[in-house]
From Swiss-Prot:
It comes from Pseudomonas putida (strain ATCC 47054 / DSM 6125 / CFBP 8728 / NCIMB 11950 / KT2440). HAMAP family: PQQ_syn_PqqD. This is PqqA binding protein 1. Belongs to the PqqD family. Signal peptide: none annotated.
Length: 91
């Protein structure tokens, strides 16, 4: 089954993506705690706005990182993990 890049990701209610100086990086805050995101997840997370579809996020990051062939696959993997962990909803 292929990933539908026309889906629009949005953070679930109660989840907030932000930079946390104490963690020296981006985190995902939620009522029960916090998840520290790695650099690539932070780049993807920064583009999740409830407006852009996955294809637009891929396009944006492919422009920022030309010549990196796995960008699209990495973004799809992030979306699948984030959905499985209930961080995002895909509509």
């Amino acid at each position: 089954m292929s990933f539908d890049r026309n889906q629009v990701p949005n953070w679930r209610p109660g989840y907030r993506f932000q930079y946390e100086p104490a963690q020296k990086g981006h985190v995902l805050l939620y009522p029960e705690g916090m998840i520290k995101l790695n650099d690539s997840a932070s780049l993807i997370g920064g583009l999740i706005d409830g407006q852009r579809d996955v294809a637009a996020i891929i396009s944006e990051l492919e422009q920022q990182f030309p010549g990196v062939p796995e960008v699209a696959d990495d973004i799809e993997q992030f979306m699948e993990v984030a959905r499985a962990e209930h961080w995002i909803v895909l509509a």
